[in-house]
Amino acid sequence: MTLINHNKGKEQATATASYPTANYPTANYPTDSIDWLTRLIAFDTVSRHSNLALIEDVQAYCEQLGLTVDLTFNDVKNKANLFVTVPAGANADDVNHGLVLSGHTDVVPVDGQEWTSEPFTATIRGDKLYGRGACDMKGFIACALTLLPQAVKLSNAGQLRRPLHLALSFDEEVGCLGAP
């Protein structure tokens, strides 16, 4: 990944980074939201394709944090929803209620669209990051994944007052088919 100086008034920088999905999951996970977003954009999760590579990568990350992941699959088992809970710290058995961070993993197709950069490679031009799903909704997922270790730390210290849930679904772009 190319490091970029985002200071205003400096020369505009352009950087690209991609992660080959064949090498996932991996033990080397990002620690900031831009690197997470770069990683997530590299997964081609257009609604007509499987989202399993992305889901399995997030699953391995969550399990590395000591969390239990529940997956629910579509009928043909090529797409999955992911649900994970960080329990309330004071009562590790308390997984009810709390806050759900919910997002979808699929993106709309790029067919017939003119891109000035590869849509499944995060590209930073100036102070903007471009890539399919950057705003809808892999950016949100990147932020949630970046903060997940902090929630686990708070839970382990007995300081997370309510459970925190992360729910990732498939096929929102084609009628919310993956939403329970």
Where are these regions (language model features)?
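Acidic/His- and Gly-rich active-site-bordering loop/insert found
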Residues: 2-15, 19-20, 24-134, 153-160, ...
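Acidic/histidine-rich catalytic neighborhood of metal-dependent amide-processing enzymes
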Residues: 137-180
